[in-house]
Amino acid sequence: ASSIRDRIDKLEKEARAAKRLFEENDDEAYKTAVSSLYSRLRATWERALEDIVFANVVMRHRDYIDTKNLKRVTALEEADVQIFQNGFKKCCDFVDAHDPSRGHDPEPPEPSEVMADIKSLKDWSEKLRSKMNGVS
């Protein structure tokens, strides 16, 4: 599995490729690319929750709980939770995994917004990792 940083790097590259489609007015290809990107962004938010917030204490598909990093979880604050929820929810709005409700089939965000959403995850994960590393 890729690290959070590697995943974010790939997402940034995908966003730059999608931006070219946007600039070429290839609306259908851009919409497809952005939907795919937000699906991976959503998965990266999930992985960051597991790896950073829960400090690998609890991991999917592992049959034990590793309590040695449990204290690090205390660095999580309400603002961190809000940023996570906002970023994750936005991803859910743009992925094909969910059938859009009638009247709610949003246009994909413009490239600058896509990059801002990736940056939100990047900033959140780096800030939280730093806070958690400060827990002794």
Language-model regions, residue ranges each:
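Long, charged low-complexity segments
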Residues: 1-25, 32, 36-136
